[in-house]
Amino acid sequence: MALSRAKPDELPRDAVVITEDQALKYQWKIITSWDKIGEVWSLRYTPGILSALAAGTGAYINNHYRTKLRLGGHGRLSTYLPIVAVPAIFTMLAHKFFIQRPILLNPLGECPVCIQMRSAAFQTSLGIVYPTILAPFAAFLFATRCYTYRIPSITENPREVFLLWRKFTRPIVPALGTLIGLQALLTMFLTGQEDKQNFKLMLRMREIEHQVEEEHLPQRMDF
């Protein structure tokens, strides 16, 4: 059965009213059990793809600062968890809740470009900007604690700390700009595919429902 949204006074008498959570669960049941993966691949795999991109970017940024500050094996887990794992998890959750949920529950209820832009903003913020801000702080902290690199005191010489941060960050600025552009474009493309495939899935469900209704209608008899 295809889902549809309507006002209470517009509901047919035999309509089954369900909550948004129930509707979302029903939609996911259809998507995961759909026999043609090519028709629903973006809905299934986009959160995982975006999560992997965020994890890869976080690992790249974290490794850059760790290498510059000669950390070696010091604090490896303590930096990878917040800079690699957390962005990956938050990126997936943000996409599922703020992007996929509106697409599945209210198709055509919002401007497609607006959804794509919002999705790209979440991806670049959580997957690139957040690790870029956190990674140098974590690396500086462990470098000071483990004595792997001489870090000026941030309270006594904040300007020197800033210059050191700029020195280490400048080499990866072009790469970060490229990553932001590529991830934004890929995220917008995948989100557009989600919107398109969900709409086609809804039309297909209505078509199947119409066929079933026709098959169960009593045969017309002409005299």
Swiss-Prot record:
<feature type="transmembrane region" description="Helical">
    <location>
        <begin position="79"/>
        <end position="99"/>
    </location>
</feature>
<keyword id="KW-0812">Transmembrane</keyword>
<feature type="topological domain" description="Mitochondrial intermembrane">
    <location>
        <begin position="145"/>
        <end position="171"/>
    </location>
</feature>
<comment type="subunit">
    <text>Associates with mitochondrial complex I assembly intermediates during its biogenesis.</text>
</comment>
<feature type="transmembrane region" description="Helical">
    <location>
        <begin position="124"/>
        <end position="144"/>
    </location>
</feature>
<keyword id="KW-0472">Membrane</keyword>
<keyword id="KW-1133">Transmembrane helix</keyword>
<feature type="topological domain" description="Mitochondrial intermembrane">
    <location>
        <begin position="63"/>
        <end position="78"/>
    </location>
</feature>
<feature type="transmembrane region" description="Helical">
    <location>
        <begin position="40"/>
        <end position="62"/>
    </location>
</feature>
<dbReference type="GO" id="GO:0031966">
    <property type="term" value="C:mitochondrial membrane"/>
</dbReference>
<feature type="transmembrane region" description="Helical">
    <location>
        <begin position="172"/>
        <end position="192"/>
    </location>
</feature>
<dbReference type="InterPro" id="IPR009801">
    <property type="entry name" value="TMEM126"/>
</dbReference>
<dbReference type="GO" id="GO:0032981">
    <property type="term" value="P:mitochondrial respiratory chain complex I assembly"/>
</dbReference>
<protein>
    <recommendedName>
        <fullName>Transmembrane protein 126</fullName>
    </recommendedName>
</protein>
<comment type="similarity">
    <text>Belongs to the TMEM126 family.</text>
</comment>
<keyword id="KW-0496">Mitochondrion</keyword>
<feature type="topological domain" description="Mitochondrial matrix">
    <location>
        <begin position="193"/>
        <end position="223"/>
    </location>
</feature>
<feature type="topological domain" description="Mitochondrial matrix">
    <location>
        <begin position="100"/>
        <end position="123"/>
    </location>
</feature>
<comment type="function">
    <text>As part of the MCIA complex, involved in the assembly of the mitochondrial complex I.</text>
</comment>
<dbReference type="Pfam" id="PF07114">
    <property type="entry name" value="TMEM126"/>
</dbReference>
<feature type="topological domain" description="Mitochondrial matrix">
    <location>
        <begin position="1"/>
        <end position="39"/>
    </location>
</feature>
<dbReference type="GO" id="GO:0005739">
    <property type="term" value="C:mitochondrion"/>
</dbReference>
